[in-house]
């Protein structure tokens, strides 16, 4: 991996309050291209809250976020995804009753036009998800296999596959 001085993500003086509870206070963080960064701390220290702020799930009460040097206001996780930032949630956020391929594309499914209607393109979902799983060397029976049939490690791998399937610049876990 090649490391550079290019800062992909910078958080400046991030604070998050839930009523009278201070979950984060003046957190500063920067992540450079090619860098792997771990955030550690005690239970209740605010690690998950910080990750949810960075991924657009929570709006910071104070502070600023910069992506590739540009100040950004994240209104939703879709905003962070559009900037190339993806998150693998602690609970993995997988739908056990859906196949692997549909979990990878959940919310971003390729469609095909059928007159006035759009329908999910299941063939494309399967082809693209199998190609991505192969690229990541994730071995499963089929992209049609339901997530609930997978082991815990395989589920984690599928969550990572989803986070990396859409040209992410930064993956938060």
State where each predicted segment sits.
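Glycine-rich phosphate-binding loops of nucleotide-dependent enzymes
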Residues: 1-173
């Amino acid at each position: 991996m090649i490391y550079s001085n290019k800062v992909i993500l910078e958080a400046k003086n991030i604070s998050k309050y839930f009523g009278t509870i201070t979950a984060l206070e003046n957190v500063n963080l920067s992540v450079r291209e090619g860098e792997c960064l771990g955030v550690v701390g005690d239970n209740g220290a605010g690690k998950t809250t910080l990750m949810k702020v960075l991924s657009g799930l929570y709006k910071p009460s104070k502070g600023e976020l910069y992506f590739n040097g540009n100040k950004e206001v994240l209104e939703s996780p879709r905003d962070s995804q559009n900037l190339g930032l993806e998150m693998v949630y602690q609970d993995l956020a997988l739908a056990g009753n859906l196949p692997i391929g549909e979990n990878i594309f959940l919310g971003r499914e390729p469609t095909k036009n059928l007159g006035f209607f759009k329908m999910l393109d299941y063939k494309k979902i399967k082809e693209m998800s199998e190609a991505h799983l192969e690229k990541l060397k994730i071995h499963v029976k089929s992209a049609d296999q339901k997530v609930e049939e997978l082991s815990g490690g395989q589920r984690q791998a599928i969550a990572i596959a989803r986070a990396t399937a859409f040209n992410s610049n930064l993956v938060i876990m």
